[in-house]
Swiss-Prot record:
Substrate binds at residue 109. InterPro entries: PsdUridine_synth_cat_dom_sf (IPR020103), PsdUridine_synth_TruA (IPR001406), PsdUridine_synth_TruA_a/b_dom (IPR020097), PsdUridine_synth_TruA_C (IPR020095), TruA/RsuA/RluB/E/F_N (IPR020094). It catalyses: uridine(38/39/40) in tRNA = pseudouridine(38/39/40) in tRNA. This is tRNA pseudouridine synthase A. The keyword Protease does not apply.
Amino acid sequence: MRILVEIAYQGNNFLGFQIQQNGRTVQQQFEKLLQRMHKRHVRIHPSSRTDRGVHAIQQYFHFDTELNIPMSQWQYAMNRTLPDDIYVNNVVTVDDDFHCRYDCVGKRYRYKVYQAQHRDPFQSGLKTFIPETLDLGKMNRAAQQFIGTHDFTGFCSQKTEVESKVRTLYQSEIVKTDDGFDYIVTGSGFLYNMVRVLVAFLIEVGKGRHEVSDVPKLLESKNRKNVPFTAPAEGLYLEKIYLDENELLKDFGNDIKIHRKKSLQND
């Protein structure tokens, strides 16, 4: 039987989602829990592999089990033993050919920034602090330039190992908040550090160090050295996973291009 689990977690005290040789990860917490239940190793398969310090409001993984536990009890059984910085929101059965990664057709990230004269210790790890005044309108105009299908070679980590760095963004916008702004981006998939590089670039635009008109040129150059900054992980949230293409079409229109993850790698 294949089970799909929806979870949320605060990333401050994790080295990321994926198992690391030394260190605490989200995958490690769940596989340790499932091993106790099954008396054997059970591998989980996530929709996304968040990095160290990145939070998730909605994340999914699936695993296979032979245990005859009522579906209504899985959530309780997991939450009673999980640490306080992880929570299981829902557990359902899925078809045996369902795959959490390959059936994912889109993801949405939100990057949270607060602006003030002084750093707020109560925001530490949850939002990124920027004391400078930024031109949010200009930043939003630059953000809109990323919507569509582009080669994001110049806007991801040089450690990205995948062959194709072409991704499609359905949404890319700056939204003003009471204490700063959020950057919201939805796409077919994301390269390693791509969202954080986009945020860092948009902040440079807000400071007047780049222009809106620079975006097409930087995309065309495919040179990471032209965008050398990466925003901190602490303000980044994996906000939504699209497992249903109809939901994606509902949010962004029937004309968008749907990508299947069997042709994409990374993120």
